UniProtKB/Swiss-Prot annotation:
It comes from Streptococcus thermophilus (strain ATCC BAA-250 / LMG 18311). Monomer. The lineage of its organism: Bacteria, Bacillati, Bacillota, Bacilli, Lactobacillales. InterPro entries: T_IF-3_C_sf, T_IF-3_N_sf, Translation_initiation_fac3_CS, Translation_initiation_fac_3, Translation_initiation_fac_3_C, Translation_initiation_fac_3_N. IF-3 binds to the 30S ribosomal subunit and shifts the equilibrium between 70S ribosomes and their 50S and 30S subunits in favor of the free subunits, thus enhancing the availability of 30S subunits on which protein synthesis initiation begins. Belongs to the IF-3 family. Its main location: cytoplasm. This is Translation initiation factor IF-3. It is found in: Cytoplasm. The gene is infC. Pfam families: IF3_C, IF3_N. GO terms for molecular function: ribosome binding; translation initiation factor activity. GO terms for biological process: ribosome disassembly. It comes from the Bacteria. One of its GO terms (cellular component) is cytosol.
């Protein structure tokens, strides 16, 4: 059964058609019935009459407990949202002439991000005449990648973009 938003569902007294194709509690077809008879059947069973396909001719109405239906639908949606994981990209900025202590600090931050399951974009910004020594920047990025290879894979290799060189690391899927 296709789940329809509340605005598309008409329940009990909101239904404004003469006859409906009726579906019972267990999903059995009860045929085309006048609206008054369908509502009487629903009232006898102490449940709701809900139009589930208003565009059909005649509209399809189902006898169901609408409160339970709504609860199950919300529960299913909540479960789907729980299964979704949002992966964010964190950035670690380095310099081509970075000191060893600073490098270790940035490396620690990058590892923390990767352990939390985030992707890490490692970037190096070249200032002034440093741009002529791209190999120094590439060496720094290679060292960063080497020191995180136990928890990350290189998703995008080192690449130049204007005055910036960057690469992207992603956590190894089974080590989140």
């Amino acid at each position: 059964m296709k789940i329809i938003a509340k605005k598309d569902l008409f329940i009990n007294d909101e239904i404004r058609v003469r006859e409906v194709r009726l579906v019972g509690l267990d999903g059995e077809q009860l045929g085309i019935k006048p609206l008054s008879e369908a509502q009487a059947i629903a009232d006898d069973a102490n449940v709701d009459l809900v139009i589930i396909q208003p565009q059909a001719t005649p509209p399809v109405a189902k006898i169901m407990n609408y409160g339970k239906f709504k609860f199950e639908y919300q529960k299913k949606r909540k479960e789907q949202r729980k299964k979704q994981s949002v992966v964010t990209v964190k950035e670690v900025r380095l310099s081509p002439v970075i000191d060893k202590g600073d490098f270790e600090t940035k490396l620690r931050n990058g590892r923390k991000f990767l352990e939390k399951g985030n992707k890490v974009k490692v970037s190096i910004r070249f200032k002034g005449r440093m741009i002529t020594h791209k190999e120094i920047g590439a060496k720094v990025l290679a060292e960063f990648a080497e020191k995180t290879q136990d928890i990350a894979i290189i998703e995008q290799r080192a690449k130049m973009d204007g005055r910036q060189m960057f690469m992207q690391l992603a956590p190894i899927p089974d080590k989140k």
